[in-house]
């Protein structure tokens, strides 16, 4: 092998959702990138539920897509049931979700990875990092060492190890080391990382038993068909990309199910003290649900097919680590599951994660230069949260190599910005999941405008290809043309257009009205307006029509939110230098000093969001920073 085989700009460790997006982003941004995975066959694998998107999560997928990422494209190629959640509510909380064929999804991701220029994939487990100990500039990463002793060099490394760092599986009283069922853990790497100055703790997650769908009685369940017409996930996607569509089903646990679980809690690793890690609040195990909601006589279960060519079913809602004999009994007590055959047991898995307050907004670690963390190791849960972090870390790893400034979106620019800011400012003690409720500016952060918010900046950083840019530019121009066309037209009670509007739509008109303003009426939409002969048929592109309507109907709310953002931004981006001496700021209490020292915020905005931070403390910081700036100028 030539020396170039061992030397890269960026190395990504791990081929899951964070790792693949990180490697693809680094390569698109111009870095010669190596993706190391313990098994090439599992690149892009969906380890838990076979679904992409949902409330908050779908927003992240759209943002990944707007920045040129792969997740939405793969979802379009693998989605076997599609739904728009909150379809009857406002655009800020509408979310796209697809049930995915896990084999089609994995294949789609692998094809995208293998077709990406600048990106090499190599199968190897990583046991250690090569760290340069610089006396003056601090520690920095220089590469990795594999299990077989190969040394790969790079000036930026992205670690996306998922649940593999010291992973331990629990099924009842049985426990053993694993990264997920069937895969070995990264035990040596975990031990090496514990020797470094990182704050490390344990989290846990779980997965339900898988069921042979041929052994279920669907007549006892409620069918849940997908939407018609079908949505798409990617801005570049088409309905024709989707494979064959199928239904999901809904059933429920019974009182017998709950009795079985209560009678076996003493054998649950969750309640025996065997598991130390904290699990995800919003995806609790069935044991947790039965204990925490003791008054409920049943819990809903979504019966989700794992793919078109397999018989396995994913019973969403019964994640468990109970012993297998208990799993079998509880499964067969569920409506329609009396004859169920379990193909794989459910289990819980504990793993190492790093306190994300040890990260910069770029996801570079504060302790080791050039080392980036992304995904579950930062305390998050979910494919979408991992993929979004991976894209950001991969991009910034490439920019680190190229000596370019790091980039991270603000809270008012992207859910990705909310995610990262929450993590690096507040940290987390339980797996973090994205919800629309976490964003204070969610009317600005809609699925439908992810491209408008992020594609321009993505293009400037090399993430967006020519085809996407051309289509995005065309959409923008079409929105502007249609908005201008309608705003130039006026309807009055006496003119022909006004009479057409009244006759066609049955709406009253007492004074001269701009046609565009008609969309602001609650009972009217762009589609309704286009039924007026003089105005129709309108634009063919549904995305363009949607942007025109939302831009008009919510103009007042959007303007007020933009004003609020402008006020908040006054000091948001004021930087705080690395190594800033908080003890030198006169008037800061010891409590505030300790909080600032622990988080080490990179900006005044981040400092403001530290729990317990006072307006007085922020004022003192601003005064001190301004004095320092003036003394440097002088």
Curated annotation (Swiss-Prot):
This is tRNA uridine 5-carboxymethylaminomethyl modification enzyme MnmG. FAD binds at residues 14-19. One of its GO terms (molecular function) is flavin adenine dinucleotide binding. SMART domains: GIDA_assoc_3. Homodimer. Heterotetramer of two MnmE and two MnmG subunits. GO terms for cellular component: cytosol. The keyword Flavoprotein applies. NAD(+) binds at residues 279-293. NAD-binding protein involved in the addition of a carboxymethylaminomethyl (cmnm) group at the wobble position (U34) of certain tRNAs, forming tRNA-cmnm(5)s(2)U34. Coiled coil: none annotated. It is found in: Cytoplasm. One of its GO terms (biological process) is tRNA methylation. The keyword Mitochondrion does not apply.
